[in-house]
């Protein structure tokens, strides 16, 4: 019997969610930072995909990791905590704050939360969960 080659590190799914597409667009901007406002799963799913193009993207890509209560009642506290740390430790050329599917459903005003944080750098905010489409739709949304 012939030896079979294994391709275990190959991801055959080429259409990830819109959150990943938007993060990929901003990941291509020098010194841009990205915050995925959503569950840890969404962050790691996108991170795994983005690492293929930029193995050091985790330095510029963060997740808020809201708990179950926040996903129901709002992620403002989680997002403000992440934004405060970012403001103290970094100076990005631009910041993307994007909501995942679950957080998009509760209707948090992430642009309002970003204004409350008084960030000293340009900030772009939008919902980019998979409910709006796949990778391509997220990339197009980010490019607007």
Predicted ranges, named:
Residues 1-144:
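An N-terminal assembly and electron-transfer interface module characteristic of large anaerobic redox
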């Amino acid at each position: 019997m012939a030896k079979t080659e294994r391709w275990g590190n190959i991801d055959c799914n080429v259409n990830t969610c819109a959150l990943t597409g938007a993060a990929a667009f901003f990941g291509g901007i020098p010194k841009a930072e990205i915050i995925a406002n959503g569950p840890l799963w969404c962050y790691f799913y996108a991170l795994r995909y983005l690492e293929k193009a930029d193995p050091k993207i985790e330095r510029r890509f963060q997740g808020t990791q809201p708990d179950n209560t926040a996903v129901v009642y709002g992620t403002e506290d989680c997002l403000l905590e992440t934004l405060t740390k970012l403001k103290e430790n970094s100076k990005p050329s631009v910041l993307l704050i994007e909501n995942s599917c679950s957080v998009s459903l509760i209707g948090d005003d992430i642009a309002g939360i970003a204004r409350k944080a008084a960030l000293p750098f340009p900030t772009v905010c939008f919902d980019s969960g998979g409910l709006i489409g796949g990778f391509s739709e997220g990339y197009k949304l980010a490019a607007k």
